[in-house]
Amino acid sequence: MKLETLAVHAGYSPDPTTKAVAVPIYQTTSYAFDSTQHGADLFDLKVPGNIYTRITNPTNDVLEQRVAALEGGVGALAVASGMAAITYAIQTIAEVGANIVSTAKLYGGTYNLFAHTLPRQGIEVRFAPHDDIAAMEAMIDENTKAVFCESIGNPAGNIVDLQALADAAHRHGVPLIVDNTVATPVLCRPFEHGADIVVHALTKYIGGHGNSLGGMVVDSGKFPWAEHKDRFPLLNTPDPSYHGVVYTEAFGPAAFIGRCRVVPLRNMGAALSPFNTFLILQGLETLSLRMERHCENAQKVAEYLQQHPQVAWVKYAGLKDNPEHQLAQRYMGGKPPAAILSFGIKGGQEAGARFIDALQLVLRLVNIGDAKSLACHPASTTHRQLDDEELEKAGVPRDLIRLSIGIEHIDDILADLEQALEASK
């Protein structure tokens, strides 16, 4: 099936008892066992079924199947936020003494997790420029558990050469984890370009309406964990916390996502509310239609800003003179690369503040991927915790303004930008 069809139908058919067409909200904490033996079999992973909503939930299961189908994975795990998805993906395979290698240009929350939180838990993160594959490969050693990048960077809008980075990681027996939040599977399916694990903030484009937090981890099922037993003991040796299970033996190709569910999620508990899942499923059904308008509007906004005398620079890989335009064309299927763009106003940070304060239609907030157009100044919000050196590494100059272009009529978006640019002088 095509992506548009999968987004509406994958993972669910009308309920056999009630014939309900909409996915039901299973607002329950727990599930009855048929017998003592049935309960024991569920806990031993001998039979499929539900035990407790922190681990599995029928509403969440539909969303997991649907996103896995859209990405082309063997399985997925829904969690409470995009940050939980990133954290759990790493904790599934990394422990004290391990390291991961990451691009330096990242969403501010991810950078903070990598630069400050994970190191305090004994996991080192090594940063390199997103466009220097050789530098990233040189950082991989015997303790490296993963390479991490964003398919489209937030807020810089940079494009990573996914296939080249995947090849570099695989030469050392290391998986590539890709945050595909900004591109979504409508524009880019990282598994088709060598990635092994995909993470999403469902909060953004997949939910699409700024009403619910959610995250997703998707497993390609292609990485040969069992061939790298020394590098990945957490998947290849008995787990005393779960009846001595060996995940590569019990789950086969789904070993990663299996452990992600029964260890990080079960033990730390960032479970996704089934009510949030219901809202996200509603958004997901129209993802392809919305992304078409998001991208069309963003391309027009970028072209408008590029010719405006009050604008110093524009970063959007959909522009033909952008140095990463060809990469965007390759990995986004020839479509505009999503709807996140950044620019600087002549007059620096003070002019940028006047611009943001003058906006009337475009909302001042730090989310992205909403149906509504949004603007923020990352250096004073999402990346506020970074010092000047870290801001430079993250590709966030102090005059950068990030726009998340919505699905409103383009004339109204441009009119608001025009009057705000005039007010910024």
For each predicted feature, which ranges?
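N-terminal glycine-rich, Lys/His-bearing helix-loop that initiates the first secondary-structure elements
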Residues: 1-50
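Glycine-centered tight turns that cap/initiate beta-strands
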Residues: 72, 143, 310-313, 361, ...
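Conserved small-domain helix->loop->beta segment predominantly found in fold-type I
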Residues: 268-271, 275-277, 282, 286, ...
